[in-house]
Structures are given as structure tokens and as C-alpha cells.
Amino acid sequence: MNGRLHMTGKELIFQTLRHEPTPRAPWVPFAGVHAGALVGATATQVLTDEETLVRALLEVNRLYKPDGQPVVFDLQLEAEVLGCGLVWADDCPPSVSSHPLADTMTVPCRCTLPTAESGRMPMVLSAMRRMKEAVGDTTALYGLLCGPFTLASHLRGNDIFMDMFDDEDYVKDLLGFCADCAKR
């Protein structure tokens, strides 16, 4: 507690993460692209325009009063940087449409791992900084990432499932690359 009678949502989240008793379960709405609808914006606008994203996130915070909230829920950010094609729609996050490793059982060079300057990452990180400034004292902010297997399936396509039987070492190497992506 912070010396006040009531703890902030952020404090509640951190208490939960420390496996300490809490007075209630934390409220963490994964608003995703629904956040855009709250301000009259499409999913595409929310996921490609920083001003729209921040405006939508602030509206989620005002309306739902969450203890914590993700800044962006787009599991294709890393895949896009690594060469996957995306299909965009105005009512949902983008979908991966092409898989750069579909025709080759290679593991990309670690020199291609996304950085803070890659793709849409600068926009997301800037939105995170702005949200931290606006609500970060009271609301826990979450940064989401694409997990290693999901990213491997984005890169390789459906062949990843046969690869698990046909070439376990390749899958382990590819998952290692994808885990490094998540760690970065």
C-alpha cells in the first residue's frame, strides 16, 4: 500500500504478481481494437496511427477504469518486421498472409531480429511512454509480444506442424530464434 486508504489498480496488479493476498481480483480488460470503436476509429487506424491509439487507450482507461491495460494487442508486429505479409481489415487486427520461410527450412540471421526502430515498434513504444505519463502512476501498462511458437508459425506457415515430426532440430532452432525475438 502507498499510505492511502485505498491502493491503486497498479498496486493491486503488482501485489497479485507477487502472489500476495489482494482485496479483489484485478480488472485488466484486453480492449484490443475495440478501443478504436470507442473513439470512432477502425482497427487499422488504432494499429497504425499513434494519435488514434493513445486517444483510444485513454478512452478505455476513462471508461473502464482498469487496474491494468495492454497498450497494443497485435501479435503480428514482429512477424511483419520479419517479412510476413499482412492483410488488414477495419474491424479486426491484421492477419498474416504470407510466410517468408514457407519454401525454405532456414533460420533467419539474428541480425534481422526486430529492434525498437523496426516497423511499427517506434509508434507502439511512443504510445507506451505517453500512456505511462498519463496514467502510469495508477494503471499497470502491459506490453504484449508474439510468443515463440506463434511467431514460428507466422514465419513458416502450416509446415511448422509437419516439421515437428520431420525435423525436430530445425523446429528447435527456429523456436530459439523466435524466443530471442521475444527476449529482445
Residue ranges of predicted features:
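N-terminal basic, low-complexity leaders that serve as flexible interaction/assembly modules and, when applicable
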Residues: 1-91
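Active-site-proximal, glycine-rich beta->alpha crossover segments in alpha/beta enzymes
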Residues: 81-184
